[in-house]
């Protein structure tokens, strides 16, 4: 996505795990949470065997929490996550200090989506 200039998840670069686990925990890093780009989550209700789709507002996202981690824990298997990424109207989030520091060191004042992702990867790789 980042390589094709689709924005929204660049600050989440290099977070370990799977796409299906991302909404369970509402993963986040460097000023961005996955709930900001999730359009819907689809999966199987393990009690009925039926597929169900939850729209973003039905996922009860909170800080590192969601309906899949609480009410539906061990009752719902996530099979797909639909994201809404942006290209032309994307607002770069460099509010996290470490990202700004890396970009300043590289003399980047108007970063691209790729440059923010690269900065996040550099920060994560240095830990």
Regions found by a protein language model. Give the residues of each.
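Anion-binding (especially nucleotide phosphate/pyrophosphate-binding) glycine-rich loop
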Residues: 1-47
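Phosphate/pyrophosphate- and phosphate-bearing ligand-binding catalytic cores of soluble enzymes
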Residues: 52-127
